[in-house]
Swiss-Prot record:
Residues 66-103 are annotated as: Disordered. Residues 91-103 have a biased composition (Acidic residues). This is Large ribosomal subunit protein P1. Signal peptide: none annotated. It holds the Pfam family Ribosomal_60s. GO terms for molecular function: protein kinase activator activity; ribonucleoprotein complex binding; structural constituent of ribosome. HAMAP family: Ribosomal_L12_arch (MF_01478). It comes from Polyorchis penicillatus (Hydromedusa). Plays an important role in the elongation step of protein synthesis. GO terms for cellular component: cytosolic large ribosomal subunit. Keywords: Ribonucleoprotein, Ribosomal protein.
Length: 103
């Protein structure tokens, strides 16, 4: 594993360990040094989530962003009806089950 990946994982794990307590760069440095992992000094500062609720961050990982512009309700309803009419017309044409292969 690359050094940057190891450093990043060490910071992430230390932040998760500190989940119930305030996550600060100082506390993360203590945990990382106790684990005998060498990390560049800027990593804990980047991952210090002071003022953020990590529980909310964990819960929102799978949630998506806002939906793209949705069509107006009236326009969407008309499109659905047109599709149904097209399907009915196609099914009537195919009612002979293609027995007259090339009519």
């Amino acid at each position: 594993m690359a050094d940057s990946s190891t450093s990043e994982l060490a910071c992430v794990y230390s932040a998760l360990i500190l989940h119930d307590d305030a996550i600060t760069a100082e506390k993360m440095n203590k945990i990382i040094s106790a684990a005998n992992v060498n990390v560049e000094p800027y990593w804990p500062g980047l991952f210090a989530l002071e003022g953020k609720n990590i529980g909310d961050l964990i819960c929102n990982v799978g949630s998506s962003g806002p939906a793209a512009g949705a069509p107006a309700a009236g326009a969407a309803g008309g499109a659905v009806e047109e599709k149904k009419e097209e399907k009915k017309a196609e099914s009537e044409d195919e009612s002979d089950d293609d027995m007259g292969l090339f009519d």
